[in-house]
Structure formats: C-alpha cells, structure tokens
Amino acid sequence: MQLFAMALLLYSCSENETPISDTTDNQARLNFLIKTAPTNKALIHGDDGSFSSLALYIFNKADQHCEYSELIPEFTPQRLEEFSRSVNVSPQTKVIYAIANYNDPDKTFSVPVSPDLTLQQLESLTVSGNAFTDSNILMVGKKEVAINSEYVVAEVPMERLVARLDIYMFKNQGLESSSVVVNSIEFVNQILNTNSSPEVTSMPTPISKKNVSEVFLGGTTLQLMPSDLSEIVPENAHASFYTYRNIVPDATPDANTPYIRIKALFNGISYTYRGYLTDQGQTTHKYSLLHNTVYRVMAMLDHPDNQLIIKTTPYPWELTSSEIGQDITEDDYQLQPYNGDDAGAT
C-alpha cells in the first residue's frame, strides 16, 4: 500500500519536481532514505513520529548548485515514518536537505518553501505559528554524502525542531486517605517561532510566545505514586505540551524562561504551584528547553508540607543528534506553593 501511494505521488507531484537530466556528467545513482522514527519508539506521542508532507533538495557541496528538488505536499492515504528516493547525480559530494510537515496552514515561513530555494535560503529560514499538534511537528534533516562510487546509499535522520513536555501527576503514598484533585496544568512561555536549521541554536527576534493550559473539567483525582513505572508512557500523561526551543542564555531566569503552573485542591483547599523546568544540579542550559528532546516530568504532591516534588528526565528523540549532548541523569527538585507573586519561582 505504501509503495502504491508513493507511485501515485510521483505522478501527481511531478510539477513540483526538478529532475536530474541524464547527461554524461551524471555518473552515479544516489539512493537515500528519509527517516523520522525515533530511536526509542516508546517516545512517540500520537502522530509526532511521522510526516504528511516533505520537501527534498540535493545540492553540490562545492558550489551549492541544486541538482534535485521536489515538493510532496501530501501523503495519502496515510502518514509515513520513512521515505526513499533514487536519483541520478554527478560525481561530487552532495548535501541532502529535507523538511517534513512543511505544508501546514498554521506554519508561516520567512520565505515560502518552493523547489527553487537555495541551500543558503533553506538554512536561514525561520518559521512561526499559533499552535502545535502532534500531527504538525516540523522536522528538518541535513546529510553530507560523498559520491565515491556508481551507487551510493545514504540515510537522512530527521530532527524535530520542538521539545515535548509530558507531565505525569501523582500523590504521595502518605496521602492515600486524602483527596487531591488537579484542576489545571499551565505551560508558561511556549515559544511559537524558531530558526528552521537545527544547526542555528539562537532564537529569532522578536520572540513569539504564549501560555497554554490543560484544564480538567470537574478536576482529575490523583492516584498514588506507583512503584511500577511501566505505565509512564506518553499516552498516559496528564498533559503534553510542545514548544520550539527556548534558550535561556544565563543561569538567571528571565521573562522568557519556561515554567509550569499547577492548580490543585488538597482536601478541598485550593493551592497553586509554580516552578521552572530544571533541577538543582543542572548547570548547562539550566532553564532551557532544547529541540529534538522529550522531557518526562514526574510531579507528586507530598505530605505534610503540601510540596510538589518533581523529577524531570530529558530523553533525546534521536540519541545521536539531540542538543543535550551528555549522559542523562535524574535529579529531584521541589516546588513550593505559589503565593501569587510572579517575581520568584523556585
């Protein structure tokens, strides 16, 4: 079925394709695979492990001449995790560039994605939008390939330009007889614009941001913190949020620093908790949220001081290309009840 759909697309999308002419200079065949499936498939949430549209480009590395480009605005009848192409190329080192999920009405690029974009234009693109869903996650892949034989095979792994926060809430074992109800989880300073090249780690200016909430009508009663964490999987998260990378340059939080605000009832008494998404031992990118990373946030209401204890663990979507760049460790930090003053989060 997948091959049949691809055959239909080749026919229907030919007007958006810049083919390679069969000249004597084109002495090699390049077979490449676009792959979006994460190393750990357990990290997939909904459709964020697949794509529904794809823009492809092949450039000469030396002079950045585009030898091939193709826009596939829609894959039907189903989304894909992998896509392959085989094209004739000249015997020069190539740069393959791919953008997945580009054809989304909520995305606005600084320059419209078209078959005739240069490599420089692609690497300087910025993108903005108003909202995220699991089905519109922007992914970009870039791969340098040496054409050193008549038949060359390459794989282009895709990086997600977002971070995802999965928030799981529980109550301490000591609160078994207490009623703990969560009314809302708010993610403050969700970033809505980014540089589309994963290699550009700065943030565009001005920064576009907003606050988003998961509201539980009637409240959600918290269960006890389980000893078996096998059920801690994305589909069981109380809330999941996406954001473009949020780089906080200093060890001191600023107005753009991301944090969460949780409203809960403890035996009928209302509390609001606020805290940054970091841990006590973290020094590099202490307050940042990095692209291509899933953050597992375990939040537990504790007794007797009504503390909210949080354990945050970042997982690279792709182990070889995450911005984390270090071994992952789990550290606890605590959030104190929020007193209404936004000046000081802990």
What does each model-found stretch correspond to?
Residues 28-36, 165-171:
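A short, amphipathic beta-strand motif
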Residues 14-17:
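Bacterial signal peptide processing site
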Residues 86, 93-142:
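Signature of extracytoplasmic/envelope-associated structural regions
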Residues 1-3:
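Sec-dependent signal peptide recognition
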Residues 40-111, 164, 173-291, 342-346:
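Tryptophan-paired
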